[in-house]
């Protein structure tokens, strides 16, 4: 694959606690994601799955190792610079949607675009197009509490890619949904990632859904291991 490297994690180590409470989570984890590639992270709870995603998304610092986003080393960067890279290059989807309850679905998707400085009319147009792509264009004026769980998560996915990030990270994005809804949301997420040409790392417990991805990896003894 000749696509450019969007995200590279090298020798990532992360532990919590000190002394008697010392708990190593990641022990020299390596992972490379290329543009247009979808990768499923299939690992049990407690193995460091969320920690790896948080480090990849610049939400957490590793104790050792290097994180490169689009070729830029994020080690030693100021918090402001890390925040700028995260906003411009990375979209994040959580198991729980974290939508702003006082705003409509359309406004929630517009929000990151407005923060990035996009004119309101352009932000609204892109938000509307994303809602249409996720097949919930007719729900744009509804607030999160008026949406089903699947609809809420589709809005969250649209919000995550609103600024056309290079990388999409998702931590159990369908874990709180029924199997049928989870399947549709996961397929929509995977299709959106492919169409946008971004690099996607999606954590899931569901091996059937993970099989839709280009690659599957897991975490064993603190290291990222490729699954066949």
From Swiss-Prot:
Keywords, in A-Z order: ATP-binding, Cell inner membrane, Cell membrane, Membrane, Nucleotide-binding, Translocase, Transport
Enzyme nomenclature, EC number: 7.6.2.-
SUPFAM superfamilies for the chain: P-loop containing nucleoside triphosphate hydrolases
GO cellular component: plasma membrane
Gene Ontology terms for molecular function: ATP binding; ATP hydrolysis activity; transmembrane transporter activity
Residues reported in the UniProt entry to bind ATP: 43-50
InterPro entries: AAA+_ATPase, ABC_transporter-like_ATP-bd, ABC_transporter-like_CS, ABC_transpr_LolD-like, MacB-like_ATP-bd, P-loop_NTPase
Annotated compartments: Cell inner membrane
Residue ranges annotated for the ABC transporter domain, each copy included: 7-227
Gene3D superfamilies for the chain: P-loop containing nucleotide triphosphate hydrolases (3.40.50.300)
Recorded superkingdom: Bacteria
Gene Ontology annotations of biological process type: lipoprotein localization to outer membrane; protein localization to outer membrane
Function noted in UniProt: Part of the ABC transporter complex LolCDE involved in the translocation of mature outer membrane-directed lipoproteins, from the inner membrane to the periplasmic chaperone, LolA. Responsible for the formation of the LolA-lipoprotein complex in an ATP-dependent manner.
Quaternary structure (record): The complex is composed of two ATP-binding proteins (LolD) and two transmembrane proteins (LolC and LolE).
Family (UniProt): Belongs to the ABC transporter superfamily. Lipoprotein translocase (TC 3.A.1.125) family.
PANTHER family recorded: IMPORT ATP-BINDING PROTEIN, LIPOPROTEIN-RELEASING SYSTEM ATP-BINDING PROTEIN LOLD
UniProt-recorded name of the protein: Lipoprotein-releasing system ATP-binding protein LolD
Organism for this UniProt entry: Rhizobium meliloti (strain 1021)
């Amino acid at each position: 694959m000749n696509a450019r490297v969007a995200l590279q994690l090298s020798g990532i180590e992360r532990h919590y606690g000190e002394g008697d409470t010392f708990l190593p989570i990641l022990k020299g984890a390596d992972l490379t994601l290329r543009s247009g590639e979808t990768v499923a992270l299939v690992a049990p709870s407690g193995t460091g799955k969320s920690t790896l995603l948080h480090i990849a998304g610049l939400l957490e610092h590793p104790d050792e190792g290097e994180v490169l986003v689009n070729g830029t080393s994020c080690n030693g960067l100021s918090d402001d610079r890390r925040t700028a890279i995260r906003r411009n290059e990375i979209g994040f989807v959580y198991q729980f949607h974290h939508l702003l309850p006082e705003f409509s679905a359309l406004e929630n998707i517009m929000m990151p675009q407005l923060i990035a400085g996009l004119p309101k009319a352009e932000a609204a147009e892109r938000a509307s197009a994303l809602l249409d792509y996720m097949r919930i264009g007719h729900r744009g004026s509804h607030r999160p509490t008026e949406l089903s769980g699947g609809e809420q998560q589709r809005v969250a996915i649209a919000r995550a890619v609103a600024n056309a990030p290079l990388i999409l990270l998702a931590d159990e994005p369908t874990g709180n949904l029924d199997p049928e809804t989870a399947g549709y949301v996961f397929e929509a997420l995977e299709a959106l990632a492919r169409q946008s040409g971004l690099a996607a790392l999606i954590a899931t417990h569901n091996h059937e859904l993970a099989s839709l991805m280009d690659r599957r990896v897991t975490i064993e003894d603190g290291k990222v291991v490729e699954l066949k």
